[in-house]
């Protein structure tokens, strides 16, 4: 008699967005392209890595003085401090007053896992989470698995082809008292001074707890300080918050999964208490975070010359993205593609919306073998001199073929 498996009743999981990459890999068309990679790509179609990171990795590997003992539960102290200085500035108010701290995590997903665990245990009145970003984020799954009620909103206005701050403000207006707000892509959402004031006032009056997501610092504008400037607004207004800080993408060490859960409190005593609880959760989640990526980043950030070289490499990536967007827009103009394409260059960062509807996206995938997400948000570093003509002509074809549909 056959033995029944304990896994008999386990169903196949629902397909996620990652299945797009699987479909792409199964496609045997020689012209196929994938424009949704999360990492920055070079002009030759390889993942981008800063040259100073390559050199630093080699130096660390050849350093006989280094040991490979377990990392402390809270992570490398020098790495966490360097990460905080990068985010807020070494002489910022929150650093000087010892109101900011952090825990080294396994990438941004680890930061959200750790933060969600804390909120579930110690902020039981905040069991509703709003995730507001320029795109659909995977963090909702983490909060859902923790038992939170999750609502996801985007402030991309597909009708007017822009990121609309009023959509963000509207979500805050209708959010319940005491909820958690996971906010990403703030650098892309151009709020006026009056809108900033309105946002702060609304969040304070409703006692909303902000949980920021900063995965691409320096890769939005090319200016590290500018990309994190919005955090200073919240600090200056006396907000307490969490922040998921990923350093994998802007250093080009995607396989290392290097991140920090940043904590800002009203005073140092509160910070120490929060960090003590986070340490207990981290001990249960992963105990000891990985070392190599943290060592690379600390070495670069703590050496002025190396940090300067790294900053220049970020500026180079952003400049290339801006030029690529300009070329795409110009080629679409020369092709006579219907509609305005100014929204392409008005968006910041490597990941931006093309402004295509679902029918046009499906046409690109099925007819042209160009794989992009349903929302039409692509990685512009995937476009280079070898494929730009095919991509723009395919976009033109998709728009013209479906010209009776609204973008």
Curated annotation (Swiss-Prot):
Its main location: cytoplasm. Transmembrane segments: none annotated. This is Putative aspartate aminotransferase, cytoplasmic 2. It catalyses: L-aspartate + 2-oxoglutarate = oxaloacetate + L-glutamate. SUPFAM superfamilies: PLP-dependent transferases. Gene3D superfamilies: Aspartate Aminotransferase, domain 1, Type I PLP-dependent aspartate aminotransferase-like (Major domain). In eukaryotes there are cytoplasmic, mitochondrial and chloroplastic isozymes. InterPro entries: Aminotransferase_I/II_large, Asp_trans, PyrdxlP-dep_Trfase, PyrdxlP-dep_Trfase_major, PyrdxlP-dep_Trfase_small. PANTHER family: ASPARTATE AMINOTRANSFERASE (PTHR11879), ASPARTATE AMINOTRANSFERASE, CYTOPLASMIC 2-RELATED (PTHR11879:SF6). Its EC number is 2.6.1.1. One of its GO terms (biological process) is aspartate biosynthetic process. GO terms for molecular function: L-aspartate:2-oxoglutarate aminotransferase activity; pyridoxal phosphate binding. Coiled coil: none annotated. Signal peptide: none annotated. It comes from Bos taurus (Bovine). Its cofactor is pyridoxal 5'-phosphate. The modification N6-(pyridoxal phosphate)lysine is found at residue 249. Keywords: Aminotransferase, Cytoplasm, Pyridoxal phosphate, Transferase. GO terms for cellular component: cytosol. Belongs to the class-I pyridoxal-phosphate-dependent aminotransferase family. It is found in: Cytoplasm. Homodimer.
């Amino acid at each position: 008699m056959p033995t029944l498996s304990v896994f008999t009743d386990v169903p196949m999981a629902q397909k996620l967005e990652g299945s797009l990459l699987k479909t792409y890999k199964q496609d045997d068309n020689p012209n196929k392209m994938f424009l949704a990679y999360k990492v920055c790509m070079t002009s030759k179609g390889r993942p981008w890595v800063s040259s100073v990171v390559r050199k630093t990795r080699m130096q660390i590997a050849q350093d006989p003085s280094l040991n490979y003992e377990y990392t402390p539960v809270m992570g490398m102290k020098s790495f966490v401090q360097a990460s905080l200085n990068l985010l807020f500035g070494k002489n910022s108010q929150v650093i000087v007053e010892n109101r900011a701290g952090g825990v080294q995590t396994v990438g941004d997903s680890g930061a959200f896992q750790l933060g969600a665990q804390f909120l579930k245990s110690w902020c039981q009145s905040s069991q509703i989470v709003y995730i507001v970003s320029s795109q659909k984020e995977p963090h909702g799954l983490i909060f859902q698995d923790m038992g939170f009620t999750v609502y996801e909103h985007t402030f991309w206005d597909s009708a007017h082809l822009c990121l609309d701050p009023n959509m963000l403000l509207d979500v805050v207006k209708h959010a319940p008292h005491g909820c958690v707000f996971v906010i990403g892509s703030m650098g892309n959402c151009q709020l006026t001074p009056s809108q900033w004031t309105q946002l702060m006032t609304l969040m304070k009056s409703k006692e909303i707890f902000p949980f920021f997501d900063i995965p691409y610092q320096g890769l939005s504008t090319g200016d590290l300080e500018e990309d994190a400037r919005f955090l200073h607004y919240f600090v200056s207004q006396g907000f307490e918050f969490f922040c998921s800080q990923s350093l994998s993408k802007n250093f080009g060490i995607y396989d290392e999964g290097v991140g920090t859960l940043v904590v800002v409190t009203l005073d140092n005593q509160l910070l120490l208490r929060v960090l003590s609880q986070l340490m207990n959760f981290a001990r249960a989640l992963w105990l000891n975070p990985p070392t190599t990526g943290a060592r690379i980043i600390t070495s670069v950030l703590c050496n002025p010359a190396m940090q300067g070289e790294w900053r220049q490499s970020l500026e180079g990536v952003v400049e290339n993205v801006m030029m690529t967007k300009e070329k795409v827009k110009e080629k679409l103009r020369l092709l006579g593609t219907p509609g305005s394409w100014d929204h392409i260059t008005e968006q910041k960062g490597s990941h931006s919306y093309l402004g295509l509807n679902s029918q046009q996206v499906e046409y690109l995938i099925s007819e042209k073998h160009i794989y992009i997400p349903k929302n039409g948000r692509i990685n512009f570093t995937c476009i280079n001199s070898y494929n730009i003509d095919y991509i723009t002509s395919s976009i033109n074809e998709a728009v013209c073929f479906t010209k009776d549909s609204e973008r």
